[in-house]
């Protein structure tokens, strides 16, 4: 891993979730769960992710090109028939066997503040368990405080050991969250 003190050179922070039981997936009224479908999935993923991350990414280059790509791993939440949140229950060879990877969580701005990030992530954690992954991890940026709060609510904990910068960065993140 890189060791430069320059923020752009630092790796994303990592959060891990152990084998503890998952909460039930009981979506709020008016929210539906959909699995990726070829007819609408790529455009819906690009719209949500590009809007949330404020950059342009191609579904084919970022997701479909990965060996982990399977339609059932990309989950959407919808309201009134339109996708408003997405996340992926991914796999990465660099992580130990039995570990799922929570990937590209995005909620459209007009749907924020409804805990949809929580619900789409929980749906992905359930998908990981169906695939035999009892552990989960994710990578995120220090400034994504609302997302980090959601990950804590889902039972994720900070990884303090995988990079020398993590202890100080997590101390700052936790102070910003007032935890």
Task: For each feature predicted by the language model, list its residue ranges.
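Conserved acetyl-CoA-binding loop-helix of GNAT-fold acetyltransferases
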Residues: 104-107, 113-130, 149-153
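A conserved beta-strand-loop-helix scaffold within acyl/acetyltransferase catalytic domains
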Residues: 50-107
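Conserved beta-strand-loop-alpha-helix junction that forms the acyl-donor binding cleft
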Residues: 138-148, 163-171
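Conserved acetyl-CoA-binding loop of GNAT-fold acetyltransferases
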Residues: 3-6, 152-161
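Acyl-donor-binding surface of acyltransferase catalytic domains
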Residues: 1-29
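Conserved GNAT acetyl-CoA-binding A-motif
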Residues: 128-140
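Short amphipathic alpha-helix that is part of the acyltransferase structural core
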Residues: 25-57, 175-179
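Long, contiguous binding/interaction regions
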Residues: 2, 20-22, 91, 169, ...
């Amino acid at each position: 891993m890189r060791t430069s003190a320059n923020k752009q050179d630092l790796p994303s922070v990592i959060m891990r979730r152990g084998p503890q039981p998952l909460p039930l997936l009981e979506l709020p009224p008016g929210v539906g769960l959909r699995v990726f479908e070829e007819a609408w999935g790529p455009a819906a993923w690009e719209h949500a992710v590009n809007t949330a991350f404020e950059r342009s990414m191609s579904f084919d280059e970022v997701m479909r090109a990965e060996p982990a790509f399977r339609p059932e791993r990309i989950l959407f939440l919808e309201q009134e028939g339109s996708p408003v949140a997405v996340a992926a229950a991914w796999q990465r060879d660099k992580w130990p066997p039995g570990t799922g990877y929570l990937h590209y969580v995005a909620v459209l701005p007009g749907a924020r503040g409804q805990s949809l990030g929580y619900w789409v992530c929980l749906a992905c954690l359930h998908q990981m368990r169906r695939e035999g992954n009892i552990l989960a991890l994710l990578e995120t940026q220090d400034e994504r405080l609302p997302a980090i709060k959601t990950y804590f609510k889902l039972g994720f904990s900070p990884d303090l050991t995988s990079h020398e910068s993590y202890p100080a960065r997590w101390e700052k993140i936790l102070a910003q969250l007032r935890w």
